[in-house]
């Protein structure tokens, strides 16, 4: 019995040493990625794909004394563009002649960003170095992020060895299969970026403009709201809450985001006017994105996120309405 116990303790000690070694190896790369995401000038083309759909996007990223700016141009013929200036994001949709303006969240960008500190992330993910590879002809360090439960996806990252810029990511499902991919096919690092390269080619004057509310709700405000979520997956906390006006929608939509520091889920609550045939009931998915919808007290609740179906269902079925005094 003592021998067995000694073997278990010895094995646990080795596992702990390996875990500590992995953490020590990954942390510098996360810090390097964080710096690269906000300190480099570059221009390139990346592909973003899920299922059989593949989109090609041109990106121009600039950092100067005026701040951080970015321009994304869709190469699929729609002419859609996304302009980022600090935390202000302008999305241009030529096909619907509309423009959406809102404030961005830290992770809502390309290339995808990841937390710089492992911290609480370790409670829900295992992080380790996973060898070397090349992307767009550039040497990279691979990092594997594995979930500790079935309520979130894993990630495989390819980080540029010289600059720390994230050049490729795979989002991995419960069977460790890629369900979404982001990858640079061409990248050029620049000394500076001309101002006109960050301006859209589209004349937006005759477009309809929609602007998100500029007064996000705090967690305390949510506690006073008529809506609350009784059960969240472990580690998930409110990241954002605000009212949106969505194109082709008359009534404003309440939008909340919950995150574990890596995965995020959006909850949309809107008045159900019984006129929309687009409302989702039950579960649905498109590639890595899962969704769950239901009606409640004359409202329609939709939960969407790049997480397993079980996660959006858990959150969707936990949304409740309460009468306030």
What are these regions (language model features)?
Residues 2-68, 76-77, 104, 120-122, ...:
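N-terminal leader/targeting segments and the immediate start of mature chains
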Residues 39-43, 65-71, 137-144, 165-168, ...:
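Short, hydrophobic/aromatic-rich segments at coil-to-beta transitions
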Residues 106-155:
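Intrinsically disordered, low-complexity linker/loop segments enriched in Gly/Pro
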Residues 136-205:
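Gly/Pro-enriched, hydrophobic low-complexity segments
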Residues 57-63, 131, 155-159, 184-185, ...:
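Hydrophobic/aromatic beta-strand elements that line small-molecule binding cavities or substrate pockets
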Residues 54-58, 151-155, 167, 179-180, ...:
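Short, surface-exposed coil-to-beta transition loops
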């Amino acid at each position: 019995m003592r021998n067995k116990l000694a073997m278990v303790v010895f094995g646990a000690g080795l596992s702990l040493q390996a875990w500590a070694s992995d953490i020590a190896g990954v942390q510098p790369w996360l810090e390097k990625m964080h710096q690269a995401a906000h300190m480099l000038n570059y221009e390139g083309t990346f592909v973003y794909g899920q299922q059989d759909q593949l989109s090609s996007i041109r990106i121009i990223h600039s950092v100067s004394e005026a701040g951080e700016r970015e321009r994304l141009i869709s190469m699929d013929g729609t002419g859609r563009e996304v302009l980022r200036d600090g935390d202000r994001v302008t999305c241009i949709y030529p096909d619907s002649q509309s423009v959406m303006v809102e404030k961005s969240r830290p992770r809502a960008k390309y290339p995808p960003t990841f937390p710089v500190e492992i911290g609480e992330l370790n409670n829900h993910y295992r992080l380790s170095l996973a060898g070397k590879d090349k992307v767009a002809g550039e040497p990279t360090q691979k990092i594997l992020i594995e979930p500790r439960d079935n309520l979130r996806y894993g990630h495989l990252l390819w980080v540029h060895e010289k600059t720390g810029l994230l050049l490729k990511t795979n989002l991995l499902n419960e069977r460790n299969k890629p369900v979404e991919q982001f990858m640079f096919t061409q990248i050029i690092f620049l000394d500076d970026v001309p101002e006109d390269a960050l301006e859209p080619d589209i004349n937006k004057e005759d477009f309809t403009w929609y602007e998100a509310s500029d007064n996000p709700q705090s967690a305390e405000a949510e506690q006073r709201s008529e809506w609350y979520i009784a059960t969240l997956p472990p580690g998930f906390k409110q990241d954002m809450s605000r009212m949106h006006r969505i194109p082709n929608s008359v009534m404003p939509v309440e939008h909340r985001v919950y995150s574990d520091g890596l995965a995020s889920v959006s909850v949309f609550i809107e008045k159900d006017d019984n006129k929309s045939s687009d409302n989702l009931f039950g579960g649905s998915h498109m590639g890595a994105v899962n969704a769950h919808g239901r009606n409640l007290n004359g409202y329609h609740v939709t939960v969407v996120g790049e997480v397993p179906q079980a996660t959006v269902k858990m959150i969707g079925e936990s949304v409740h309405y309460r009468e306030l005094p």
